[in-house]
Protein backbone atom coordinates (compact mmCIF):
# COMPACT_ATOMS: atom_id res chain seq x y z
CA UNK A 1 0.00 0.00 0.00
CA UNK A 2 1.21 3.52 -0.82
CA UNK A 3 0.19 6.95 0.42
CA UNK A 4 1.04 10.37 -0.95
CA UNK A 5 2.77 12.96 1.22
CA UNK A 6 3.91 16.28 -0.28
CA UNK A 7 3.85 14.76 -3.77
CA UNK A 8 6.27 11.97 -2.75
CA UNK A 9 5.33 8.31 -2.80
CA UNK A 10 5.90 6.72 0.60
CA UNK A 11 5.74 2.96 1.09
CA UNK A 12 4.08 1.43 4.13
CA UNK A 13 6.48 -0.12 6.65
CA UNK A 14 5.58 -3.64 5.53
CA UNK A 15 6.03 -2.82 1.86
CA UNK A 16 9.33 -1.07 2.56
CA UNK A 17 10.62 -4.08 4.48
CA UNK A 18 9.68 -6.39 1.63
CA UNK A 19 11.31 -4.04 -0.84
CA UNK A 20 14.62 -3.96 1.06
CA UNK A 21 14.57 -7.73 1.53
CA UNK A 22 14.04 -8.24 -2.20
CA UNK A 23 17.05 -6.01 -2.94
CA UNK A 24 19.24 -8.13 -0.66
CA UNK A 25 19.36 -6.36 2.71
CA UNK A 26 19.60 -8.72 5.66
CA UNK A 27 18.29 -6.15 8.15
CA UNK A 28 15.54 -4.20 6.37
CA UNK A 29 14.56 -2.32 9.54
CA UNK A 30 18.08 -0.90 9.88
CA UNK A 31 18.09 -0.05 6.18
CA UNK A 32 14.83 1.86 6.56
CA UNK A 33 16.28 3.83 9.47
CA UNK A 34 19.37 4.70 7.45
CA UNK A 35 17.30 5.91 4.50
CA UNK A 36 15.06 7.97 6.76
CA UNK A 37 18.09 9.61 8.36
CA UNK A 38 19.72 10.28 4.99
CA UNK A 39 16.64 11.88 3.43
CA UNK A 40 15.23 13.81 6.40
CA UNK A 41 15.20 17.61 6.33
CA UNK A 42 15.62 20.28 3.69
CA UNK A 43 19.41 20.43 3.56
CA UNK A 44 21.42 19.96 0.38
CA UNK A 45 22.62 16.48 1.34
CA UNK A 46 19.08 15.27 2.05
CA UNK A 47 17.84 16.64 -1.27
CA UNK A 48 20.63 14.91 -3.21
CA UNK A 49 20.08 11.65 -1.34
CA UNK A 50 16.40 11.70 -2.23
CA UNK A 51 17.44 11.88 -5.87
CA UNK A 52 20.17 9.24 -5.96
CA UNK A 53 19.25 6.75 -3.20
CA UNK A 54 16.83 4.66 -5.31
CA UNK A 55 19.69 3.80 -7.68
CA UNK A 56 22.22 3.58 -4.84
CA UNK A 57 20.14 0.97 -3.01
CA UNK A 58 19.95 -1.18 -6.12
CA UNK A 59 23.71 -0.97 -6.65
CA UNK A 60 24.41 -1.76 -3.01
CA UNK A 61 22.13 -4.78 -3.35
CA UNK A 62 24.47 -6.20 -5.98
CA UNK A 63 27.32 -6.37 -3.46
CA UNK A 64 28.20 -9.09 -0.97
CA UNK A 65 27.02 -7.05 2.01
CA UNK A 66 24.39 -4.40 1.16
CA UNK A 67 23.85 -3.64 4.87
CA UNK A 68 27.52 -2.76 5.33
CA UNK A 69 27.41 -0.70 2.16
CA UNK A 70 24.45 1.41 3.28
CA UNK A 71 25.99 1.88 6.73
CA UNK A 72 29.20 3.08 5.09
CA UNK A 73 27.20 5.44 2.88
CA UNK A 74 25.58 6.94 5.97
CA UNK A 75 28.93 7.23 7.76
CA UNK A 76 30.33 9.17 4.82
CA UNK A 77 27.52 11.67 5.04
CA UNK A 78 27.74 11.99 8.81
CA UNK A 79 31.47 12.64 8.55
CA UNK A 80 31.59 14.79 5.43
CA UNK A 81 28.11 15.49 4.08
CA UNK A 82 27.95 19.13 5.13
CA UNK A 83 31.61 19.93 4.40
CA UNK A 84 32.32 18.18 1.11
CA UNK A 85 30.92 18.34 -2.38
CA UNK A 86 31.22 14.58 -2.86
CA UNK A 87 27.44 14.03 -2.95
CA UNK A 88 27.03 16.54 -5.74
CA UNK A 89 29.86 14.83 -7.59
CA UNK A 90 28.13 11.45 -7.22
CA UNK A 91 24.83 12.91 -8.39
CA UNK A 92 26.54 14.12 -11.56
CA UNK A 93 28.70 11.02 -12.14
CA UNK A 94 26.69 7.83 -12.40
CA UNK A 95 29.78 5.70 -13.01
CA UNK A 96 31.51 7.02 -9.88
CA UNK A 97 28.40 6.46 -7.76
CA UNK A 98 28.03 2.91 -9.03
CA UNK A 99 31.70 2.18 -8.37
CA UNK A 100 31.42 3.61 -4.87
CA UNK A 101 28.43 1.38 -4.09
CA UNK A 102 30.35 -1.67 -5.28
CA UNK A 103 33.27 -0.75 -3.03
CA UNK A 104 31.22 0.10 0.06
CA UNK A 105 29.22 -3.13 -0.11
CA UNK A 106 32.23 -5.39 -0.72
CA UNK A 107 35.25 -4.00 1.15
CA UNK A 108 35.27 -3.09 4.83
CA UNK A 109 38.88 -1.92 4.53
CA UNK A 110 38.18 0.55 1.73
CA UNK A 111 34.95 1.69 3.35
CA UNK A 112 36.89 2.62 6.47
CA UNK A 113 39.64 4.22 4.38
CA UNK A 114 37.20 6.44 2.50
CA UNK A 115 35.81 7.64 5.80
CA UNK A 116 39.27 9.04 6.53
CA UNK A 117 39.87 10.65 3.12
CA UNK A 118 36.63 11.39 1.32
CA UNK A 119 38.50 13.31 -1.39
CA UNK A 120 39.52 9.93 -2.81
CA UNK A 121 35.94 9.46 -4.01
CA UNK A 122 36.66 11.92 -6.81
CA UNK A 123 39.20 9.44 -8.23
CA UNK A 124 36.31 7.11 -9.08
CA UNK A 125 35.20 9.41 -11.86
CA UNK A 126 38.47 9.30 -13.79
CA UNK A 127 40.47 6.15 -14.56
CA UNK A 128 43.66 8.21 -14.88
CA UNK A 129 43.44 9.11 -11.19
CA UNK A 130 43.11 5.43 -10.33
CA UNK A 131 46.31 4.38 -12.07
CA UNK A 132 48.98 3.10 -9.68
CA UNK A 133 51.91 5.48 -9.44
CA UNK A 134 55.28 4.41 -10.81
CA UNK A 135 58.20 3.69 -8.50
CA UNK A 136 59.89 6.79 -9.86
CA UNK A 137 56.93 8.97 -8.88
CA UNK A 138 56.84 7.39 -5.43
CA UNK A 139 60.56 8.08 -4.98
CA UNK A 140 60.04 11.74 -5.87
CA UNK A 141 57.47 12.03 -3.08
CA UNK A 142 59.58 10.22 -0.49
CA UNK A 143 62.61 12.30 -1.50
CA UNK A 144 60.65 15.47 -0.91
CA UNK A 145 59.63 14.21 2.54
CA UNK A 146 63.26 13.39 3.37
CA UNK A 147 64.27 16.95 2.57
CA UNK A 148 61.34 18.54 4.35
CA UNK A 149 61.29 16.44 7.52
CA UNK A 150 64.94 15.43 7.77
CA UNK A 151 65.23 16.55 11.39
CA UNK A 152 61.81 15.51 12.74
CA UNK A 153 61.06 11.82 13.07
CA UNK A 154 57.41 12.36 14.01
CA UNK A 155 56.62 14.45 10.95
CA UNK A 156 58.57 12.15 8.65
CA UNK A 157 56.83 9.07 10.05
CA UNK A 158 53.45 10.74 9.62
CA UNK A 159 54.23 11.59 6.00
CA UNK A 160 55.38 8.05 5.20
CA UNK A 161 52.46 6.30 6.83
CA UNK A 162 49.96 8.72 5.32
CA UNK A 163 51.53 8.08 1.93
CA UNK A 164 51.15 4.32 2.41
CA UNK A 165 47.49 4.74 3.41
CA UNK A 166 46.81 7.08 0.51
CA UNK A 167 48.49 4.96 -2.18
CA UNK A 168 47.16 1.61 -0.97
CA UNK A 169 43.70 3.19 -1.00
CA UNK A 170 44.22 4.38 -4.59
CA UNK A 171 45.33 0.91 -5.68
CA UNK A 172 42.46 -0.74 -3.83
CA UNK A 173 39.88 1.55 -5.43
CA UNK A 174 41.46 0.90 -8.82
CA UNK A 175 41.36 -2.86 -8.36
CA UNK A 176 37.78 -2.85 -7.07
CA UNK A 177 36.78 -0.69 -10.05
CA UNK A 178 38.36 -3.08 -12.54
CA UNK A 179 40.95 -0.58 -13.72
CA UNK A 180 43.98 -2.73 -12.86
CA UNK A 181 44.41 -6.50 -12.62
CA UNK A 182 45.00 -8.60 -9.52
CA UNK A 183 48.68 -9.09 -10.32
CA UNK A 184 49.26 -5.43 -11.14
CA UNK A 185 47.61 -4.33 -7.90
CA UNK A 186 49.84 -6.62 -5.82
CA UNK A 187 52.96 -5.38 -7.59
CA UNK A 188 51.88 -1.75 -7.17
CA UNK A 189 51.29 -2.21 -3.44
CA UNK A 190 54.72 -3.82 -3.13
CA UNK A 191 56.29 -0.83 -4.88
CA UNK A 192 54.67 1.45 -2.30
CA UNK A 193 56.16 -0.59 0.55
CA UNK A 194 59.60 -0.68 -1.10
CA UNK A 195 59.67 3.08 -1.67
CA UNK A 196 58.57 3.92 1.86
CA UNK A 197 60.89 1.45 3.59
CA UNK A 198 63.83 2.61 1.48
CA UNK A 199 63.16 6.26 2.34
CA UNK A 200 62.66 5.40 6.01
CA UNK A 201 65.98 3.56 6.10
CA UNK A 202 67.66 6.53 4.42
CA UNK A 203 66.22 8.87 7.07
CA UNK A 204 67.43 6.58 9.85
CA UNK A 205 70.95 6.28 8.40
CA UNK A 206 71.27 10.05 7.99
CA UNK A 207 70.00 10.63 11.52
CA UNK A 208 72.46 8.19 13.07
CA UNK A 209 75.39 9.58 11.06
CA UNK A 210 74.64 12.88 12.77
CA UNK A 211 74.14 11.22 16.16
CA UNK A 212 77.44 9.32 15.91
CA UNK A 213 79.24 12.46 14.77
CA UNK A 214 80.77 10.78 11.73
CA UNK A 215 80.95 11.89 8.10
CA UNK A 216 79.94 8.58 6.56
CA UNK A 217 78.01 5.55 7.77
CA UNK A 218 80.13 2.98 9.66
CA UNK A 219 78.03 0.24 8.05
CA UNK A 220 75.98 -0.47 4.98
CA UNK A 221 72.50 -1.78 5.80
CA UNK A 222 70.09 -3.61 3.54
CA UNK A 223 66.51 -4.85 3.79
CA UNK A 224 65.85 -8.28 2.29
CA UNK A 225 62.14 -8.82 1.62
CA UNK A 226 60.77 -12.23 2.60
CA UNK A 227 57.47 -14.10 2.51
CA UNK A 228 54.56 -12.51 0.66
CA UNK A 229 56.44 -9.22 0.65
CA UNK A 230 59.40 -10.91 -1.00
CA UNK A 231 57.06 -12.50 -3.53
CA UNK A 232 55.54 -9.09 -4.38
CA UNK A 233 52.16 -10.15 -3.05
CA UNK A 234 51.47 -7.29 -0.64
CA UNK A 235 47.77 -6.70 -0.02
CA UNK A 236 45.77 -3.99 1.78
CA UNK A 237 46.99 -4.85 5.27
CA UNK A 238 50.11 -6.98 4.79
CA UNK A 239 53.05 -6.97 7.14
CA UNK A 240 56.45 -6.47 5.53
CA UNK A 241 58.40 -9.67 6.28
CA UNK A 242 62.10 -8.90 6.10
CA UNK A 243 65.66 -9.67 7.18
CA UNK A 244 67.98 -6.79 8.10
CA UNK A 245 71.70 -7.16 7.38
CA UNK A 246 74.67 -4.86 7.89
CA UNK A 247 78.29 -4.91 6.79
CA UNK A 248 81.02 -2.71 8.30
CA UNK A 249 82.46 -0.01 6.10
CA UNK A 250 86.13 -0.35 5.16
CA UNK A 251 87.31 2.00 7.89
CA UNK A 252 84.98 0.82 10.68
CA UNK A 253 85.36 -2.00 13.18
CA UNK A 254 82.52 -4.44 13.75
CA UNK A 255 81.70 -3.04 17.18
CA UNK A 256 81.06 0.45 15.85
CA UNK A 257 79.22 -0.93 12.82
CA UNK A 258 77.01 -3.11 15.01
CA UNK A 259 76.14 -0.24 17.35
CA UNK A 260 75.35 1.98 14.38
CA UNK A 261 73.19 -0.66 12.69
CA UNK A 262 71.20 -1.28 15.88
CA UNK A 263 70.40 2.42 16.27
CA UNK A 264 69.44 2.71 12.60
CA UNK A 265 67.04 -0.22 12.96
CA UNK A 266 65.59 1.36 16.08
CA UNK A 267 64.85 4.53 14.11
CA UNK A 268 63.50 2.53 11.18
CA UNK A 269 61.05 0.63 13.34
CA UNK A 270 59.94 3.81 15.10
CA UNK A 271 59.19 5.45 11.74
CA UNK A 272 57.23 2.49 10.43
CA UNK A 273 55.49 1.16 13.51
CA UNK A 274 56.35 3.22 16.58
CA UNK A 275 54.01 5.51 18.56
CA UNK A 276 55.23 8.56 16.66
CA UNK A 277 52.01 9.27 14.76
CA UNK A 278 48.31 8.43 14.68
CA UNK A 279 48.62 7.16 11.11
CA UNK A 280 48.30 3.34 10.78
CA UNK A 281 51.46 1.37 11.42
CA UNK A 282 53.51 -0.32 8.72
CA UNK A 283 54.46 -3.57 10.43
CA UNK A 284 58.03 -4.63 9.71
CA UNK A 285 57.94 -8.32 10.66
CA UNK A 286 61.43 -9.67 11.34
CA UNK A 287 60.43 -13.14 12.57
CA UNK A 288 61.98 -14.87 9.53
CA UNK A 289 65.46 -13.65 10.47
CA UNK A 290 68.15 -16.16 11.50
CA UNK A 291 67.23 -17.69 14.88
CA UNK A 292 63.77 -16.16 14.56
CA UNK A 293 62.54 -14.18 17.56
CA UNK A 294 65.61 -15.24 19.53
CA UNK A 295 68.05 -13.71 17.05
CA UNK A 296 69.27 -10.11 16.83
CA UNK A 297 67.07 -7.75 14.80
CA UNK A 298 69.97 -6.87 12.52
CA UNK A 299 72.82 -9.25 11.77
CA UNK A 300 76.19 -8.82 10.11
CA UNK A 301 76.83 -10.28 6.68
CA UNK A 302 79.58 -12.48 8.10
CA UNK A 303 77.26 -13.77 10.83
CA UNK A 304 74.55 -14.52 8.26
CA UNK A 305 77.07 -16.41 6.16
CA UNK A 306 78.13 -18.54 9.11
CA UNK A 307 74.58 -19.14 10.32
CA UNK A 308 73.10 -20.22 7.01
CA UNK A 309 76.08 -22.44 6.23
CA UNK A 310 76.10 -24.21 9.58
CA UNK A 311 72.78 -23.87 11.36
CA UNK A 312 69.94 -23.05 8.97
CA UNK A 313 66.98 -25.43 9.17
CA UNK A 314 65.11 -26.73 6.14
CA UNK A 315 62.26 -24.24 6.53
CA UNK A 316 64.75 -21.35 6.72
CA UNK A 317 66.30 -22.46 3.46
CA UNK A 318 62.87 -22.74 1.87
CA UNK A 319 61.98 -19.26 3.14
CA UNK A 320 64.87 -17.89 1.09
CA UNK A 321 63.03 -18.84 -2.12
CA UNK A 322 61.16 -15.54 -1.93
CA UNK A 323 64.06 -13.45 -0.66
CA UNK A 324 64.80 -10.34 -2.74
CA UNK A 325 66.32 -6.90 -2.37
CA UNK A 326 63.86 -4.33 -1.02
CA UNK A 327 65.76 -1.31 0.32
CA UNK A 328 69.10 0.09 1.42
CA UNK A 329 72.55 -1.07 0.32
CA UNK A 330 71.97 -2.78 -3.05
CA UNK A 331 75.50 -4.20 -3.29
CA UNK A 332 75.22 -5.82 0.12
CA UNK A 333 71.86 -7.30 -0.85
CA UNK A 334 73.30 -8.66 -4.09
CA UNK A 335 76.17 -10.33 -2.23
CA UNK A 336 73.75 -11.91 0.26
CA UNK A 337 71.41 -13.19 -2.44
CA UNK A 338 74.12 -14.54 -4.74
CA UNK A 339 76.64 -15.87 -2.21
CA UNK A 340 74.41 -17.00 0.66
CA UNK A 341 70.80 -17.39 -0.48
CA UNK A 342 71.20 -18.83 -3.98
CA UNK A 343 73.29 -21.91 -3.03
CA UNK A 344 70.68 -22.79 -0.39
CA UNK A 345 67.51 -22.15 -2.35
CA UNK A 346 68.82 -23.48 -5.67
CA UNK A 347 71.11 -26.36 -4.57
CA UNK A 348 73.05 -28.27 -7.19
CA UNK A 349 73.16 -31.43 -5.08
CA UNK A 350 70.34 -33.81 -4.19
CA UNK A 351 68.34 -33.18 -1.03
CA UNK A 352 69.21 -35.20 2.05
CA UNK A 353 66.63 -37.36 3.83
CA UNK A 354 66.33 -34.74 6.57
CA UNK A 355 65.66 -32.02 3.99
Where are these predicted regions, by residue range?
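A nucleotide- and high-energy phosphate-metabolite-utilizing enzyme signature
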Residues: 4-355
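Conserved phosphate-interacting/catalytic interface
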Residues: 1
Amino acid sequence: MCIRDSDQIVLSVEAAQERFESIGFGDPDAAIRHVQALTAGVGRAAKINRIILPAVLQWLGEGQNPDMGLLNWRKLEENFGTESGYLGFLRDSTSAAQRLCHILSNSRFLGDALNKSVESISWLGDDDNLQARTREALDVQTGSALERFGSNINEFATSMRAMRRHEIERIGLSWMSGVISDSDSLKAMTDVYDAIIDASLTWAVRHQIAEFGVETAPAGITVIAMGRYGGREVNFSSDADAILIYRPADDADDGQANAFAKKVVEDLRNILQGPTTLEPKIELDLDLRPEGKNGPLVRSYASCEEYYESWASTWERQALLRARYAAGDAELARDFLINIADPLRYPTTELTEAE
